[in-house]
């Protein structure tokens, strides 16, 4: 019990409006990132990297971080690059395309819809 302060840090993820949380208590600071991907050219809003960095410089007593494939070397391409590749596949396709994606990847589903609509408009 007692007073505490909560602040939110925008993170990039396939789920829109994802945030990390910073909790300041009299006992110390706890930060949980939620699942995130550092994407410098995201389809949606940018990650608040400077805010996350400032919190880190000020000091964190407990960090709970989650990032899929964080243990693998390298980095994951930006969602913008993925969309460009999908657009290229659509342009080259001469027949039916079957597309699979995570149901939680709302931005990808939205981008597929935008590409599809633009192709339908080109046919008219």
Residue ranges and their predicted role:
Residues 1-124:
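His/Asp/Glu-rich metal-coordinating catalytic cores
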